[in-house]
Amino acid sequence: MEQGQDTPWTQSTEHINIQKRGNGQQTQKLGRPNLTQLMDHYLRIMNQVDMHKQTASWKQWLSLKNPTQESLKTRVLKRWKLSNKQGWTN
């Protein structure tokens, strides 16, 4: 593959660098992200996914009808174990 040839991967990972000129105007320059920028992007996306999971979990939690103390305790323990397990594997 030629050095300058764009693949779907490189096209999809292009990002915009915004550089300020001396007079305050902004210019946009397309470029390929470095590893740090890709990691930042990945972490932002994963944060959004985690927030969505937490919201869905709370909605499910709030939808329970007349939960007993024991059933709540069981659910909390299961969720806690699951989140800890996922935290270590990610």
Curated annotation (Swiss-Prot):
Pfam families per record: PB1-F2
Feature type site, description Low pathogenicity: 66
Record's subcellular location: Host mitochondrion inner membrane; Host nucleus; Host cytoplasm, Host cytosol
Superkingdom per UniProt: Viruses
Region of interest called Disordered, as start-end residue ranges on this chain: 1-31
Region (Mitochondrial targeting sequence): 65-87
GO terms classed as biological process: symbiont-mediated perturbation of host apoptosis; symbiont-mediated suppression of host cytoplasmic pattern recognition receptor signaling pathway via inhibition of MAVS activity
GO cellular component, one term: membrane
Key words of the record: Apoptosis, Host cytoplasm, Host membrane, Host mitochondrion, Host mitochondrion inner membrane, Host nucleus, Host-virus interaction, Inhibition of host innate immune response by virus, Inhibition of host MAVS by virus, Inhibition of host RLR pathway by virus, Membrane, Modulation of host cell apoptosis by virus, Viral immunoevasion
Tagged with keyword Lyase: no
Keyword field contains Protein biosynthesis: no
Main location: host cell
Family statement: Belongs to the influenza viruses PB1-F2 family.
Other comment: Is not encoded in all strains, and seems to be dispensable for replication.
Primary role: Plays an important role in promoting lung pathology in both primary viral infection and secondary bacterial infection. Promotes alteration of mitochondrial morphology, dissipation of mitochondrial membrane potential, and cell death. Alternatively, inhibits the production of interferon in the infected cell at the level of host mitochondrial antiviral signaling MAVS. Its level of expression differs greatly depending on which cell type is infected, in a manner that is independent of the levels of expression of other viral proteins. Monocytic cells are more affected than epithelial cells.
Record text on subunit structure and interactions: Oligomer. Interacts with human SLC25A6/ANT3 and VDAC1. Interacts with host MAVS.
The name this protein goes by in its record: Protein PB1-F2
Gene source species: Influenza A virus (strain A/Turkey/Wisconsin/1/1966 H9N2)
Primary gene name: PB1
